[in-house]
């Protein structure tokens, strides 16, 4: 095997063309081995094997600096830069993350997981090189889907005025996670159809030289193109046309499904991980929205390139027709456009991952909330139980958006809560609303009669004394368990409160607790600093009531075990009960 002998990029440069092709096949087999057992990004990596080999064959990493956009397509890069064992041996799977990571290798320059950043990051490397009077190539590798992000276009706009070496490799597989959306993709198609000869050329218009590679999975053609641009003195775009999922028939045929995949059986492609429950919030949301759309033509569902976050498969997107809007990887545009839709009488729903919400704070604050337009934002994977890569954490959204004036941020506990909140939000016209969608699907079958327009009214679900537990959203079940532990340890029945509202205090409820409670505990599924619990602690600051806030400390976690993080932050029912007993005794 050739791959077993590759310990660094210089080993790649010792191989001839036939050996490089054999290496590519071995790398795909290694990818198949790891991904079938571990899961991960499939299609992007299978399509980038030859291009990665050619990059390391022509350029001298890490002296020549390669920056991968999103970096979900960096598995082949890791194989060739000393980390092959993570793809050849199951016991080494956890040696690497799914993204570039400078702690792993000198060949990785940034922790990257969000999209459209590579051109800007790489242009910074190039600028620093020039300021210091150094040389060397700087290469940004970006997929065509990532070009729909504004930061990518900002970076290309800047690159067009550079007067030194800067290479942008456009990996064009005619796909984002799902299909691409946006006018610029007509130009990419025109360039593909004309072998890069079309007079209308986005990259030339931005001031970059341009090289086209018709077959981006042809190692010889790639090597020739990269040699052509190596040590260039002006910015240049190398447009390579690749096949997403190349080498595995199912991934070639079903590109969206195989963008990322759970562990699977290689022969059949069927997932080997046991399926979850019958219901989940993706499915429930999709069912609700489609019904709502049929009843009301002004309802629309917006996604920024992740339509399945709220269950909109290709079939459902087609059923929704013009009421489904995919803006591409453009969260800023999604938020601002939603505000415009609401302003003109539409009823916009925008579903977005908590981590990606970070990309559009200004539009939420300025364009939505200052204007007080009735946009509904569903925030997904906002939990310690969500994605656990450092670049995709969903634990910062409460401090980030709950302090924006005019916004109503809601925390449902059950599916019934969630659907009632959705219905209220889409029908009202007074408030921008965000809903923190739980991870765990809970249905109690109880009808929800609460009027969410009567803002900041908590629900006392269990009346007790001495100790009150205010348990927010997805941590409400933890509050129930902690209350039971406290009762077992002390004989005291704690008061249990479901607050529903992240953005406001029910001062009447909190004032009432002063009469017969000495301790108030708050529970939230996110970081404590600037969060929900601190607001309640501040309310009781000048009173005799003692408060303790339970949540996560402020840190960047990476590939963590949830149970360990919960224990470290005293977020088990037993630990919460012990702390409560200690507070009563003091």
Question: What does each model-found stretch correspond to?
Answer:
Residues 1-79, 204, 215-219:
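N-terminal amphipathic, basic-rich helices that act as targeting or association modules
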Residues 19, 24, 28-31, 40-47, ...:
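Cofactor-pocket helix-loop regions in the catalytic cores of large enzyme subunits
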Residues 29-36, 95-111, 133-139, 314-328, ...:
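Glycine/charged-rich beta-loop-alpha catalytic/anionic-binding loops adjacent to active sites
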Residues 41-162, 299, 304, 313-314:
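Cofactor-binding active-site loop characterized by glycine-rich and histidine/acidic residues
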Residues 65, 248-358, 363-373, 470-473:
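Non-catalytic terminal/interface segments that mediate subunit docking, oligomerization
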Residues 73, 108-265, 270-278, 282-287, ...:
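Glycine-rich ThDP/TPP pyrophosphate-binding loop and its adjacent helix/strand module
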Residues 86-96, 161-175, 369-381:
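A glycine-rich helix N-cap at a beta->alpha junction
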Residues 271-275, 386-388, 408, 527, ...:
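Peripheral docking tails and interdomain loops at the edges
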């Amino acid at each position: 095997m050739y791959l077993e002998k590759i310990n660094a990029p210089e080993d790649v440069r010792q191989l001839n063309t036939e050996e490089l092709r054999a290496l590519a096949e071995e790398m795909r087999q290694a990818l198949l081995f790891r991904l079938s057992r571990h899961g991960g990004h499939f299609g992007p990596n299978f399509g980038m094997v030859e291009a990665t080999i050619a990059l390391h064959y022509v350029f001298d990493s890490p002296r020549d600096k390669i920056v991968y956009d999103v970096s979900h397509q960096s598995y082949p890069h890791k194989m060739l830069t000393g980390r092959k064992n993570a793809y050849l041996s199951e016991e080494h799977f956890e040696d690497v993350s799914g993204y570039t990571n400078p702690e792993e290798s000198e060949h990785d320059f940034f922790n990257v997981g969000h999209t459209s950043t590579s051109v800007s990051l790489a242009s910074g490397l190039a600028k620093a090189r020039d300021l210091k009077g150094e040389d060397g190539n700087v290469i940004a590798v970006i997929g065509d889907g990532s070009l729909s992000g504004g930061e990518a276009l900002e970076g290309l706009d800047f690159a067009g005025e550079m007067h030194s070496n800067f290479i942008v490799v456009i990996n064009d597989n005619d796909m984002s996670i799902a299909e691409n959306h946006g006018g610029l993709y007509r130009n990419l198609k025109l360039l593909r159809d004309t072998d890069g000869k079309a007079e209308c050329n986005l990259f030339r218009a931005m001031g970059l030289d341009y090289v086209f590679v018709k077959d981006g999975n042809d190692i010889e053609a790639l090597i020739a193109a990269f040699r052509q641009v190596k040590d260039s003195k002006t910015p240049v775009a190398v447009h390579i046309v690749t096949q997403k999922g190349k080498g595995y028939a199912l991934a070639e045929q079903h590109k969206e499904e195989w963008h990322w995949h759970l562990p699977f059986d290689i022969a059949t492609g069927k997932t080997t991980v046991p399926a979850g429950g019958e219901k989940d919030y993706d499915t429930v949301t999709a069912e609700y929205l489609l019904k709502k759309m049929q009843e009301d033509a002004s309802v629309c569902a917006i996604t920024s390139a992740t339509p399945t976050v709220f269950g909109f498969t290709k079939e459902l997107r087609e059923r929704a027709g013009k009421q489904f809007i995919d803006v591409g990887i453009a969260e800023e545009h999604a938020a601002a456009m939603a505000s415009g839709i609401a302003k003109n009488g539409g009823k916009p729903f925008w579903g977005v991952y908590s981590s990606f919400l970070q990309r559009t704070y200004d539009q939420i604050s300025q364009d939505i909330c200052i204007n007080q337009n009735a946009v509904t934002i569903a925030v997904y994977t906002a939990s310690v139980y969500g994605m656990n890569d450092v670049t995709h954490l969903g634990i910062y959204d409460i401090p980030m958006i709950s302090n924006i004036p005019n916004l109503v941020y809601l925390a449902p506990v059950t599916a019934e809560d969630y659907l009632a909140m959705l219905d209220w939000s889409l029908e009202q016209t007074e408030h921008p609303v965000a809903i923190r969608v739980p991870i765990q699907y809970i249905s109690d079958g109880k009808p929800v009669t609460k009027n969410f327009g009567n803002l900041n009214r908590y629900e006392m679900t269990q009346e007790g004394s001495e100790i009150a537990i205010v348990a927010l959203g997805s941590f409400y079940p933890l509050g129930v368990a902690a209350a039971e532990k406290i009762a077992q340890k002390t004989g005291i029945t704690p008061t249990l409160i479901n607050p529903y509202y992240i953005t406001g205090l029910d001062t009447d409820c909190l004032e009432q607790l002063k009469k017969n409670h000495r301790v108030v505990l708050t529970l939230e599924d996110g970081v404590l600093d600037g969060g929900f619990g601190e607001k309640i602690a501040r309310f009781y600051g000048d009173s005799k009531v003692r408060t303790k806030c339970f949540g996560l400390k402020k840190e960047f976690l990476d590939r963590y075990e949830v149970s360990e993080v919960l224990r470290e932050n005293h977020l088990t029912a037993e630990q919460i009960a012990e702390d409560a007993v200690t507070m009563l005794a003091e």
